């Protein structure tokens, strides 16, 4: 089998040296992706296309599908390469190849020709088109908007019968631009923004700020692995996980409510910039869109950017949510994003949309920056190729109950502000308050002879914190969902 890879048009308008470099990189990327399907596969680069030849017919569909997902490819032609002697020979071969497709259809013939011949491309189109029209009674020539277009390519003494055309994702080959670090949360925005930078030729590494234990991290790892495996598997990339619960706890405990959102983002940018510097990455990528939430106003984004010299790229800055969700659906991350949990208690109730630098800096003086340094130092760096195996590990299950027994105590893990606004009172059982950001350090001080029923408004944080406590060896925890 043979495929002809057509280059993304922006590649073809580059200078000769740049174009050759892009083609060389794309050829290497294709080899890296396809070597898993057929070890005998050959990839040959030319000035205006790349040929892929393989022997294993069983891998035809898999190879074709993989090619449509490699950045830098405009479209793929699946072809049959045969010798020919003259125009009549071209017609006879086209008749055998296309007869069934043209029955009862309107059609036209389009020919591209390279080399020296005693006929032109138009001569071949007329001869082959006329012959097909005469020999297939139910077919009819229609030069504008035909139902079927017969594509032929003539190169020297070879005829390429084009059996199918398949659209690629376009863009630049990965590796033609410098590396970036994507701040991935598993939601709609970060997945789409990561894809857009891969499509633009960047090797995208991932940085994840963990707020909810192993279950949360496993979910986001699956999104990152999916994106890499589907669009970026030609290159090795890193997945860096940072346990950000201590940072969130420090913010919730010491920072004024209205400034929490901006300061949390500033802390994330500081941490990600340190990771980027450690690995020689040139820029950060976020999924922020202008005005989508309170921290994404121009004033707040400027204040967030000010904490780092690292370039921050925001490919979705002018996109609306509907457009982003449609893109997520196209690339296959929509289902991941819809099931990714939201975290109660992390977002302030009255966030500022126009933060003042002096106020932000005054609030940050209350923050213990040694906590930020520590979580960055302890960040977990994994080769993304290992994630498939690691995410298969069993996540400890935790029981969810809607009632309680005589030895049970409800543990309200919401933030202090939420508890003050909506105190939890349940008849017949004691309720103890312990904000989620203190669980890792204070849960062991509670009476371990009791069974603790963790509760929060949405039930997401309580489940994740119960999973975390189970992983730490506390088996006396359940999730309370009345």
UniProtKB/Swiss-Prot annotation:
Pathway entry: Cofactor biosynthesis; thiamine diphosphate biosynthesis
Residues in Rhodanese domain copies: 404-482
Active site: 456 (cysteine persulfide intermediate)
EC number assigned by the record: 2.8.1.4
Disulfide-linked positions: 344-456
Gene3D superfamilies cross-referenced by the UniProt entry: 3.30.2130.30, HUPs, Rhodanese-like domain
Swiss-Prot/TrEMBL keywords: ATP-binding, Cytoplasm, Disulfide bond, Nucleotide-binding, Redox-active center, RNA-binding, Thiamine biosynthesis, Transferase, tRNA-binding
UniProt-listed HAMAP family: ThiI
Protein name from the UniProt record: tRNA sulfurtransferase
Organism: Escherichia coli (strain ATCC 8739 / DSM 1576 / NBRC 3972 / NCIMB 8545 / WDCM 00012 / Crooks)
